[in-house]
Amino acid sequence: WVRGFDEVDLLYCDSVAHVGWIKDIVRRKSVYRVTDCLAGFQKTTPVALELEKELAGSVDLVVYAARSLEDYVKQLMPKSMAYLPNAVNYAHFGQQSCARPPEYDAIPGPIALYVGAMDVWFDYRLLDEAAARLPEISFVLIGPDALAKQRLRARPNLHLLGKREYRELPRYLQHADVGLIPFDVANHSELVRSIHPLKLYEYFACG
């Protein structure tokens, strides 16, 4: 199923779904990147955990994105491991004077913005309470929001804009007043404490 690759210099894997690559692709070196504690996701199966261990033990190097993942990676028993934190594409997110998003014309400021996935580990209760207590602030969410629509009450200062293209994100961030990372530490501590959010650097780059 893999065509056009007699041999690759570096085989980069970032999902347990890539374990088949290790068996099928000839490579000089291979890397598996761990960005989250897979065991912390509710839907992770025992089979997925076994596949991750197999993948981690097969590659030349396992890199992990957060210091808090070090012990988790150690128990995967890799041949070699190294800390490689997230970083921002500054050329993209640090660009100056992006045009104001047209949606913001109908949203009064100040704007508190979240950009990213909204899954079970998102703290919907906290966000709902913040929106209720701070009616003068507009809370804007960008990203796949099917679950958010189920769990958040409709409020005049809560705006779910849905998914936006990656190329458009800097302007939404630049014209917001504060960036949010409302993750549910109380109920998903293992997962949340292992996260080193890329969005944090994107927020910083946009000022």
Task: Kindly label every feature range from the protein language model.
Residues 1-6, 45-65:
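Membrane-proximal helix-turn-helix segments that form the acceptor-binding/catalytic region
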Residues 68, 84-96:
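Carbohydrate-associated surface elements
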Residues 148-178:
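Nucleotide-activated donor-binding/catalytic signature segment of Leloir-type glycosyltransferases, i.e.
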Residues 12, 23-39:
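Active-site proximal beta-strand in glycosyltransferases
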Residues 94-106:
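A short helix/loop element that forms part of the nucleotide-sugar donor recognition site in Leloir-type
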Residues 167-171, 181-205:
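Nucleotide-sugar-dependent
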Residues 21, 40, 59-83:
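A short, active-site helix/loop in glycosyltransferases that binds the activated sugar's phosphate group
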Residues 104-122, 127-131, 139-142:
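Conserved donor-binding/catalytic core segment of Leloir-type glycosyltransferases
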